[in-house]
């Protein structure tokens, strides 16, 4: 279930019986002909599809991340490490304040991985709260499926090319360009 589809009383009732929540994080950056929000779209979709059958609430995904290397591409939004770390801490503070003690962060952007140290520090200061950080593509079954379709599995490759990350009206190649 999505937090967006709940009211405060439903969250209060949920936390009285379970303390799990999911927070997807992504980025807004170029992905060749795909959506600028591929990393956000994928982390949120994976989160919802995994958590919904378990009845675990999923917070709205954070659509921004750390991606300074793509700032030459129009539409990219990049946060500094300091800003992103503060954002993650503030969001975790809010989620934990309301009784969620087991929080899974599902990451969709490799550039966000450096925030793991912020999360470790935050968690160390809050006994009883556990935060796990997971890159959606690192689940063993997922990685095997990715490798079967896209052995290169790089940024904006077939690994991230799904009907829900494509832009209507954009032509896509029928084959994968070889790595240089």
Regions found by a protein language model. Give the residues of each.
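Extended, histidine- and acidic-residue-enriched regions that form the cofactor-binding/catalytic faces
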Residues: 1-104, 108-180
């Amino acid at each position: 279930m999505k937090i967006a589809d709940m009211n405060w009383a439903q969250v209060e009732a949920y936390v009285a019986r379970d303390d799990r929540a999911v927070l997807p994080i992504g980025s807004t950056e170029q992905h060749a002909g795909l959506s600028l929000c591929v990393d956000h779209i994928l982390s949120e979709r994976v989160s919802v599809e995994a958590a919904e059958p378990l009845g675990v609430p999923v917070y709205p995904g954070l659509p921004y991340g750390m991606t300074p290397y793509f700032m030459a591409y129009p539409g990219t939004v990049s946060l500094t490490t300091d800003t992103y770390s503060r954002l993650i801490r503030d969001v975790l503070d809010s989620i934990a304040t309301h009784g969620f003690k087991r929080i899974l962060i599902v990451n969709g952007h490799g550039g966000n991985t450096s925030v793991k140290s912020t999360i470790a520090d935050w968690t160390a200061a809050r006994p009883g709260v556990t935060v796990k950080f997971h890159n959606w593509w690192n689940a063993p079954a997922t990685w095997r499926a990715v490798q079967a379709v896209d052995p290169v599995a790089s940024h904006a490759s077939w690994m991230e090319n799904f009907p829900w990350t494509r832009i209507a009206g954009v032509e896509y190649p029928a084959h994968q360009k070889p790595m240089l």
